[in-house]
């Protein structure tokens, strides 16, 4: 089987770590992909992503802790574990320490200078490296710890110093290349897809299969036409369609084409339920397999979905069985427990509110208009009180929309979702657009809605908060540039227990310099990988010379910021790329400005 030296991948990774411009990142990836045999391009894509396989597959993690890693390095370099720990402490990076220790150990063995040895080829290839890492992950049960150490030590022993650094960083989960899926798709389009004009074909395939390695392999080996044939597959999560937001019923109906389905927006966990015969899979909006958390939903889905094969989407919400009252999203956290799930079912019972159908008995429904999808959904669901269709109306009247919204708020939900129902109202997997619009208001704030922002840095607290983190640097996602742009520094809204948990939450993501995908002019005390998402509210959107969100779009040398930002809650159900986008904040700011101007004109007339 065709293969490629690991050295080529490692050299590319090193180059990628030194640049931030997307054009350069794409150029380096294109060069790498051109050298990669189609048979192994899936493995190359996974390794660039820093994974062995997509998370949704539910495969084991590597399971190598720091002590095991140190033991493997000591065996590979034929030195004591204490020496490994000492070097890692001096350098502050166990990957770089491994590189140095390999250079020293192997130059002694060969008599070559350190520089000369770094140039020596090794026998490691992408395939044997990937396969060994898979063996490490799959080693389970009695004796697995020693087996993992031996396998990793053997891999490091055969590696060059630079390859060893790469392997250690991969095992640590700290392969911080700064490349998002969007950048990889750009490179695939240029290399195999006939140019960026065919990028939408690649993106749709990825949004339906949620596996960039698989998409790359089909594209590289069979071409763009084969990729166009991809459709949903039961058991493989589809990336969820996302909504824009507005706070004016008239504007909402204009955007949806004059008419819409308007449905309750429940404060629960978005879930994609797959059925194939007597098998059920449930995936979260982050594509995590959450089937084990909801055995009660599995039972209902098997009984109530009247189809051999189907993919439906809805919201899982905790409720009070005595009063029927719907509970907030946070209550679902109790379902995350791995033990006593039956007890959790009794204490935190759930209802399922379905709102879409994506696949039915071999037929792709994502390309059908919403009314067709909804009609088919109604036909296959045997509705009960705890497994039903989301409450909705069809309207072209803004007053009726507002009345339904107020009714929804009164019934304890977050707001409503307005969804276009014209002939082009397809299900846009993985896309945020105007076919779906959130209408949701926080009456305690001048801001029309909360926003979801990504943590990119942290500041140490003062006074009562001394000795721990007191504030976080938050960023929005710029989809066009595939970067995160700072919006605000948030230090209020946190409970003491929130602040107490911050060090442990941030520890896996702390880095010694700004992440390549973060655009910031403000310097926090600690930089953080853009991973954690939080819901934020504020008094209003404003312009700031120190924040980079949509900088220069509204006003030269000024970005969009939030005045008096306040932490609401963590959003573990959202990926960083699901955060509020820079373009959304531009639209929110412009609507806010329009509202203020209108109110001022009214006051002047009075």
UniProtKB/Swiss-Prot annotation:
Other divalent cations such as Zn(2+), Ni(2+), Ca(2+) and Co(2+) are not able to activate the enzyme. This is DNA ligase. PANTHER family: DNA LIGASE 1, DNA LIGASE 1/3 FAMILY MEMBER. Disulfide bonds: none annotated. The keyword Nucleotide-binding applies. The active site is at 265 (n6-amp-lysine intermediate). ATP binds at residues 263, 270, 285, 315, 355, 432, 438. It catalyses: ATP + (deoxyribonucleotide)n-3'-hydroxyl + 5'-phospho-(deoxyribonucleotide)m = (deoxyribonucleotide)n+m + AMP + diphosphate; ADP + (deoxyribonucleotide)n-3'-hydroxyl + 5'-phospho-(deoxyribonucleotide)m = (deoxyribonucleotide)n+m + AMP + phosphate; GTP + (deoxyribonucleotide)n-3'-hydroxyl + 5'-phospho-(deoxyribonucleotide)m = (deoxyribonucleotide)n+m + GMP + diphosphate. Signal peptide: none annotated. Optimum pH is 7.0. Its cofactor is Mg(2+); Mn(2+). Keywords: ATP-binding, Cell cycle, Cell division, DNA damage, DNA recombination, DNA repair, DNA replication, GTP-binding, Ligase, Magnesium, Manganese, Metal-binding, Nucleotide-binding. Belongs to the ATP-dependent DNA ligase family. Optimum temperature is 75 degrees Celsius. Activity declines drastically at temperatures from 75 to 80 degrees Celsius. One of its GO terms (biological process) is DNA biosynthetic process. It comes from the Archaea. DNA ligase that seals nicks in double-stranded DNA during DNA replication, DNA recombination and DNA repair. Can use ATP, ADP and GTP, but not CTP, TTP or NAD(+). GO terms for molecular function: ATP binding; DNA binding; DNA ligase (ATP) activity; GTP binding; metal ion binding.
């Amino acid at each position: 089987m065709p293969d490629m030296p690991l050295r080529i991948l490692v050299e590319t990774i090193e180059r990628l770590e030194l640049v931030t411009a997307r054009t350069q990142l794409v150029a380096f990836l294109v060069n790498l992909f051109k050298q990669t045999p189609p048979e192994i391009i899936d493995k190359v894509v996974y390794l660039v992503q820093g994974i062995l396989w997509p998370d949704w597959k539910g495969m084991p993690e590597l399971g190598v802790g720091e002590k095991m890693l140190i033991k493997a390095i000591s065996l590979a370099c034929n030195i004591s574990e204490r020496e490994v720990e000492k070097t890692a402490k001096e350098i502050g990076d166990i990957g770089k320490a491994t590189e140095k220790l390999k250079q020293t150990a192997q130059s002694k063995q060969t008599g070559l200078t350190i520089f000369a040895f770094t140039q020596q080829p090794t026998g490691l290839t992408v395939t044997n490296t990937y396969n060994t890492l898979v063996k490490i992950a799959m080693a389970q049960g009695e004796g697995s710890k020693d087996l993992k150490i031996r396998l990793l030590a053997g891999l490091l022993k055969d590696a060059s110093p630079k390859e060893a650094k790469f392997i250690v960083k991969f095992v640590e989960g700290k392969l911080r290349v700064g490349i998002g899926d969007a950048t990889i798709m750009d490179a695939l389009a240029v290399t195999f897809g006939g140019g960026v004009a065919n990028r939408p074909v690649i993106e749709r395939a990825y949004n339906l299969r949620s596996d960039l390695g698989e998409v790359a392999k089909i594209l590289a080996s069979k071409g763009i036409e084969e990729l166009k044939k991809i459709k949903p597959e039961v058991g493989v999560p589809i990336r969820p369609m996302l909504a824009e937001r507005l706070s004016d019923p008239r504007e909402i109906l204009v955007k949806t084409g004059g008419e819409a389905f308007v449905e309750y927006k429940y404060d629960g966990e978005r879930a994609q339920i797959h059925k194939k015969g007597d098998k059920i899979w449930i995936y979260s909006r982050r594509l995590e397999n959450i089937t084990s958390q909801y055995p009660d939903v599995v039972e209902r889905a098997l009984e109530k979905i009247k189809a051999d094969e189907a993919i439906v989407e809805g919201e899982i919400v905790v409720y009070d069985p005595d009063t029927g009252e719907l509970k907030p999203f946070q209550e679902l956290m109790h379902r995350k427990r791995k033990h006593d799930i039956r007890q959790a079912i009794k204490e935190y019972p759930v209802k399922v509110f379905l709102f879409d159908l994506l696949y039915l008995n071999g037929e792709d429904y994502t390309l059908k208009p919403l009314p067709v999808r909804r009609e088919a959904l109604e036909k296959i669901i045997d509705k009960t009180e705890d497994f039903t269709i989301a409450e909705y109306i069809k309207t072209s009247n803004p007053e009726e929309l507002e009345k339904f919204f107020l009714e929804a708020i009164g019934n304890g939900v977050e707001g409503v979702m307005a969804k276009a129902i014209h002939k082009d109202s397809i299900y846009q997997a993985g896309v945020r657009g105007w076919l779906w619009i959130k209408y949701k208001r926080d009456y305690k704030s001048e801001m029309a809605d909360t926003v979801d922002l990504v943590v990119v840095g942290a500041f140490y607290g003062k006074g009562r908060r001394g000795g721990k983190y007191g504030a976080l640097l938050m960023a929005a996602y710029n989809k066009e540039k595939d970067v995160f742009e700072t919006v605000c520094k948030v230090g209020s809204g946190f409970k003491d227990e929130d602040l107490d948990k911050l060090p442990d939450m941030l520890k896996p993501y702390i880095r010694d310099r700004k992440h390549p995908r973060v655009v910031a002019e403000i310097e926090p005390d600690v930089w953080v990988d853009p991973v954690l998402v939080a819901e934020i509210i504020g008094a209003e959107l404003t312009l700031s010379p120190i924040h980079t969100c949509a900088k220069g779009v509204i006003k030269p040398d000024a970005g969009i910021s939030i005045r008096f930002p306040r932490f609401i809650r963590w959003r573990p159900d959202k990926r960083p790329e699901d955060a509020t986008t820079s373009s959304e904040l531009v639209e929110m700011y412009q609507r806010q400005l329009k509202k203020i101007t209108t109110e001022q004109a009214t006051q002047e007339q009075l």
